[in-house]
Amino acid sequence: MLCALFEEQHSEFISRSGLYRYRVGDVLQVTGFYNRAPQFKFICRRNMILSVDSDKTNEEDLHNSVTRAKKILENRNYLLLEYTSCTDTSTVPGHYVLFWEIKSTCEGATPCVPLDAQLLESCCIAVEEALDYVYRRCRAHDRSIGPLEIRLVEAGAFDDLMDLLVSQGSSINQYKTPRCIESGPALRLLNSRVTGSFFSPRDPEWTV
């Protein structure tokens, strides 16, 4: 069954037979057609949730927020190759963490804007500004959530993540990068590949 989400230009594909190897609730984007058959790109899983306080951020909300921040990178000739997320409650208050793998798209004599703290901090606030009212209230008013953090990881980190999860039983044919991670070994792997850490420089906009 196909259910179009027109406002996001996404399609949700539901197949209990497993024919297309997607889980019930996966959100897909139609990227083209082969004859009359639609071709899909996996976007996210609908029901995965990040939560620190009363906030509840599902995977589609996170995807939409990251998409906004990606545009900042693309305008500076950088490409977000992969990402995932977790909540870090080792700090008080806890906060959202995004793991990003980025590469430069500069070619030839095209000058690249340095991938510096200011650029990554602007991505942090772009993500937060795109999250929902409850998250922004918790951040800006209640102070029950700390500033969002982006951790850059070295090239190949997400390939290593796939190898780890497949070794733990995930099917390599059906593997999709999880957008929210709770597994201790997976988080330890990603944290061991971190090359830089950047936090949102201010509170997101919030009004009563």
Each PLM stretch: what is its role?
Residues 1-208:
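AMP-binding adenylation
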